[in-house]
Amino acid sequence: FGGNSLSCAVGEYILETVLNDSFQSELKEKSLYLMENLVKIKTKYPNIIKDIRGRGMMIGVEVGSYANSIKALGIEKKVLLNVTSETVVRLLPYLTISIEEIDEFITKFEEIIESL
């Protein structure tokens, strides 16, 4: 943190938060919730979503040749998506995301997939 006392204080607070058992428990619940909802979309659109893989909140969605189209449609819906290869859309939400924000994302993501 470069010796800056403010940076050190912020870093300490973040570490305390992230290492807190309740934070980790909530994060695990949210990541399972996100994954379960993505699997529901995959079940509805197996011709588009080939695979979903990840760990925690780092998720890759295998979508074949649709990756760049999904990214472009995401921008229109104010959803930032990253294409990590020609066939994978990477989801990497911030760790403090709420269930309501996950629901909003899932709604928009399904609309994107449905429009293809």
Role assignments for model-derived ranges:
Residues 1-116:
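Conserved N-terminal phosphate-binding loop of PLP-dependent enzymes in the Aspartate aminotransferase
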